[in-house]
Regions:
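Conserved acetyl-CoA binding element of GNAT-fold acetyltransferases
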Residues: 65-77, 133
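Alpha-helix C-terminal capping segments
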Residues: 45-48, 89-95
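Conserved GNAT acetyl-CoA-binding A-motif
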Residues: 95-106
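Conserved acetyl-CoA-binding loop-helix of GNAT-fold acetyltransferases
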Residues: 80-91
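A generic structural signal for short coil/turn motifs at secondary-structure boundaries
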Residues: 78-81, 191
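Conserved residues at the C-terminal ends of beta-strands
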Residues: 72-74, 103, 233
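A conserved beta-strand-loop-helix scaffold within acyl/acetyltransferase catalytic domains
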Residues: 3-49, 53-65, 105-109, 114, ...
Length: 235
């Protein structure tokens, strides 16, 4: 495992897209720089394997313990047996970290869990990311086929919203749209009772990924009133 050079860092998002897992938004350069603003130090690394794998490692100082290494949604392997070639390199480059947390996007199974244990990995007691699973949807069949695959109640609700005039549109990311989106999130927090980070936290996250061409804000509206929103990320 070696540090990426200046040109490789500039081309970082192209490199992670070539990883076996196809790339993860939390392995992008925008995410690394976003976390830098929140006291994590990003390190951009490349494996010494025959086909190099690009790995973003975040380092954070934990009082009383030392440095924690964190590989969000990575390293970018597609199969569990691709991990051993990377782990020793990660341990060396993350030193003197007291622990390294990895989150490879591999399919969960009893065999995979056993193999991870054999590599010396242990399931952490707390998940960093809220989502514990990834759903992969093949978009190639087209909109009609995707809609047909939904449950009848879901299709009914979508068509009902369309008949009533609800529209979904991309919107520019500016102070007004950020305020609107954050207000929607705060209202949802109040109903559901979950923890929500500050407006400034999300504003920086959205702005960095939008500037990198990796994010777009969408609003669902009816008669000029915004009903819902989502910031979609992509590589």
């Amino acid at each position: 495992m070696r540090a990426a050079g200046p040109q490789e860092v500039r081309e970082w998002d192209e490199l992670i897209a070539q990883n076996p897992d196809g790339g993860q938004i939390l392995q992008t350069r925008a995410w690394g720089e976003f976390k830098r603003a929140h006291r994590w130090a990003p390190r951009y690394l490349l494996s010494d394997t025959e086909s190099p794998i690009a790995v973003l490692v975040l380092r954070h100082s934990v009082p009383g313990l030392g440095v924690l290494g964190y590989v969000p949604k990575g390293p970018g392997v597609a199969e569990v047996m691709q991990l051993p070639a990377l782990l020793d390199g990660l341990r060396d480059t993350a030193a003197p970290a007291f622990a390294i947390k990895v989150e490879p996007e591999i399919e969960q199974s009893a065999a995979a869990t056993s193999a991870l244990r054999d590599m010396g990995l242990e399931k952490s007691r707390h998940d960093v990311q809220i989502s514990r699973a990834t759903i992969i949807v093949d978009l190639r069949p087209g909109e009609d086929a995707l809609l047909a695959s939904f449950k009848p109640k879901c299709r009914y609700n979508i068509r009902l919203a369309q008949r009533r005039g609800v529209t979904v549109s991309p919107v520019p990311l500016d102070d007004h749209s950020i305020d609107t989106m954050y207000s929607l999130m705060a209202a949802t927090r109040d109903r559901a009772g979950f923890t929500l980070r500050s407006r400034e936290y999300f504003a920086l996250y959205w702005r960095l990924h939008a500037a990198a061409g990796q994010g777009q804000l969408f609003f669902a509206s009816l008669d000029g009133e915004v009903l819902a929103g989502v910031f979609a990320t992509y590589i």
